[in-house]
């Protein structure tokens, strides 16, 4: 019998183990992608694992833990999204000098418009939006908690629709 990560996630009972598996599922590596038509290249995130499941299955498996993991899961996703946006913006090492939060919104918009839904960034955005929505509807998360959770990355909050 073949187990995939989303199927394995549905079999786990421990929230701590589930959070660790989700962290592994959504781990990525940065690849250098050459530019086209004279543009310079950039770093691009790629999932470390090739899924035999489709994107909806991966998203459903992660979102299914929203009730039990709550803010811990949303925090993991938002921090990962911020790291990827900073990587792509090229300001990872200059966070102290440049307000990278202004670039996060553009990175998210570019991915949503130009990338297929299978993109690493898009899967995490879909998961974060759905989990944030569930937490708000269940009154488990207030706006001030979202801003505390994400820090100064206001554009990330707005772009995810968590305001």
How would you label these PLM feature ranges?
Residues 1-163:
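Extended alpha-helical scaffold segments
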